[in-house]
C-alpha cells in the first residue's frame, strides 16, 4: 500500500503517529510505543532506521537530559502526507464499490458498534 511512497507499513505507523500529534510533530519514544503497540527495543530500532533515512530527528528534551524527543523532518512530513493521501484514496475506492444501501447499512452497523464500545467503557466491572 505504501510502496509508492517508499515506505513499509511500520514506517507509516511511526510517521503517521508523529503527523497526527500536531505541530511540531514531535513525541517521546514512549508516546510512539503507546501509539504503535510495539516494544521499546523495536521502537529504538525503528527510530534508528528512520533517522538514517532522514525522516525523523532525535534530540534531548530541554531541561531533562535523559528524555529524548522524536520529530518529523520536512521529508518525513512530505512522505507521511503522501502516504496518508494514498490511504484515503484507496479507502475511497473501496467505499465507492458499495451501493448506497450497503453504505447506509455499514454506517448503521458501525454506529451500533460505537454505542457498544461506549457502554463497555462506561461499565466499571
Kindly give the residue locations of the regions a language model identified.
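N-terminal helix-turn-helix DNA-binding core of bacterial DNA-binding proteins
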Residues: 1-39, 125
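Short amphipathic alpha-helical interaction/hinge segments
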Residues: 22, 26, 84, 118-121
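Charged, amphipathic alpha-helical coiled-coil/dimerization segments
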Residues: 26, 48-108
